[in-house]
């Protein structure tokens, strides 16, 4: 059955390419993602039209996973207004995932992690750089590339501890006096973020 | 196929992730030391004009801006 399909397809390829110079890349030239029974049925109904392609036919192939675990992790750390780290090779990063602090080493299992407000530390040899992230996501790929995106990331010494204490007290008070669900949620977010900054400054 | 993951409290209260993320970012910006705080607030200023269209014609534009109009 599969032999039939390729014969039918190659026949139409020859026919199509003789008609026009600018033929689209045929599905057989790209990683074949089409079901052969579908293609055969299509050919019976519409022999002059190319079978429709699926989105995966247009996607670039995934970066290959190296057979041996690389020694370094490549980190891309971006914010909406700047690219903090681009392709930096490091030994380890510790990210504040919503399930807790997660250590990422080269060869980490591919993961998408939602980040909570907390500290991210980048370890390169004995050099450790810490940032406080407001929230974001971390995409860990099979080829030991980590893409970390956050909305705000500040080095710890840019934070004013007195402002944090004031904010914490203010939101705790708002939480106690909140009425609607939305107000409660906003106050809760305030308490969580300020407690996280407090913990970060003292930890 | 129901998901068993608990819904985060902000989503249960009707907030989207983007709203949550922006609120967190604003709170962090408010806790910065002086020169960095002013820079970040300056960076986040927006200025845009919005006009709804009806009958193929733009209606009166609405201006939303963080920069004081001179």
Swiss-Prot record, chain A:
<dbReference type="InterPro" id="IPR001469">
    <property type="entry name" value="ATP_synth_F1_dsu/esu"/>
</dbReference>
<keyword id="KW-0809">Transit peptide</keyword>
<keyword id="KW-0406">Ion transport</keyword>
<dbReference type="GO" id="GO:0045259">
    <property type="term" value="C:proton-transporting ATP synthase complex"/>
</dbReference>
<dbReference type="Pfam" id="PF02823">
    <property type="entry name" value="ATP-synt_DE_N"/>
</dbReference>
<feature type="transit peptide" description="Mitochondrion">
    <location>
        <begin position="1"/>
        <end position="26"/>
    </location>
</feature>
<dbReference type="GO" id="GO:0005739">
    <property type="term" value="C:mitochondrion"/>
</dbReference>
<dbReference type="GO" id="GO:0009536">
    <property type="term" value="C:plastid"/>
</dbReference>
<keyword id="KW-0472">Membrane</keyword>
<dbReference type="InterPro" id="IPR020546">
    <property type="entry name" value="ATP_synth_F1_dsu/esu_N"/>
</dbReference>
<keyword id="KW-0066">ATP synthesis</keyword>
<keyword id="KW-0139">CF(1)</keyword>
<keyword id="KW-0496">Mitochondrion</keyword>
<comment type="function">
    <text>Mitochondrial membrane ATP synthase (F(1)F(0) ATP synthase or Complex V) produces ATP from ADP in the presence of a proton gradient across the membrane which is generated by electron transport complexes of the respiratory chain. F-type ATPases consist of two structural domains, F(1) - containing the extramembraneous catalytic core, and F(0) - containing the membrane proton channel, linked together by a central stalk and a peripheral stalk. During catalysis, ATP turnover in the catalytic domain of F(1) is coupled via a rotary mechanism of the central stalk subunits to proton translocation.</text>
</comment>
<dbReference type="InterPro" id="IPR036771">
    <property type="entry name" value="ATPsynth_dsu/esu_N"/>
</dbReference>
<keyword id="KW-0813">Transport</keyword>
<dbReference type="GO" id="GO:0005743">
    <property type="term" value="C:mitochondrial inner membrane"/>
</dbReference>
<keyword id="KW-0375">Hydrogen ion transport</keyword>
<dbReference type="GO" id="GO:0008270">
    <property type="term" value="F:zinc ion binding"/>
</dbReference>
<dbReference type="GO" id="GO:0046933">
    <property type="term" value="F:proton-transporting ATP synthase activity, rotational mechanism"/>
</dbReference>
<protein>
    <recommendedName>
        <fullName>ATP synthase subunit delta', mitochondrial</fullName>
    </recommendedName>
</protein>
<comment type="similarity">
    <text>Belongs to the ATPase epsilon chain family.</text>
</comment>
<comment type="subunit">
    <text>F-type ATPases have 2 components, CF(1) - the catalytic core - and CF(0) - the membrane proton channel. CF(1) has five subunits: alpha(3), beta(3), gamma(1), delta(1), epsilon(1). CF(0) has three main subunits: a, b and c.</text>
</comment>
<keyword id="KW-0999">Mitochondrion inner membrane</keyword>
């Amino acid at each position: 059955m599969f032999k039939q399909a390729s014969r039918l397809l190659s026949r139409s390829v020859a026919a199509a390419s003789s008609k026009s110079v600018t033929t689209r890349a045929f599905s057989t030239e790209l990683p074949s993602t089409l079901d052969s029974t579908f293609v055969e049925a299509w050919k019976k109904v519409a022999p002059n039209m190319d079978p429709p392609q699926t989105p995966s036919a247009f996607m670039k192939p995934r970066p290959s996973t190296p057979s041996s675990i690389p020694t370094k992790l490549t980190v891309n750390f971006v914010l909406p207004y700047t690219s903090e780290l681009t392709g930096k090779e490091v030994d380890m990063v510790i990210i504040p995932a919503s399930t807790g602090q997660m250590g990422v080493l080269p060869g980490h299992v591919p993961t998408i992690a939602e980040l909570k407000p907390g500290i991210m530390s980048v370890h390169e040899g004995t050099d450790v750089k810490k940032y406080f992230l407001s929230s974001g996501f971390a995409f860990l790929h099979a080829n030991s590339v980590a893409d970390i995106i956050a909305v705000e990331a500040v080095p710890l010494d840019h934070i004013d501890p007195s402002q944090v204490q004031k904010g914490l007290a203010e939101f705790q008070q708002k939480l106690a006096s909140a009425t609607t669900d939305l107000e409660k949620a906003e106050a809760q977010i305030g308490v969580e973020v300020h407690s996280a900054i407090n913990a970060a400054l003292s930890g | 196929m129901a998901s068993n993951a608990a819904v985060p409290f902000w989503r249960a209260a009707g907030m989207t992730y983007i709203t949550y993320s922006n609120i967190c970012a604003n709170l962090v910006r408010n806790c910065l030391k002086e020169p960095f705080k002013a820079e970040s607030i300056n960076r986040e200023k927006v200025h845009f004009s919005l006009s709804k269209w009806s009958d193929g014609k733009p209606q009166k534009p609405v201006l939303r801006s963080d920069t004081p109009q001179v």
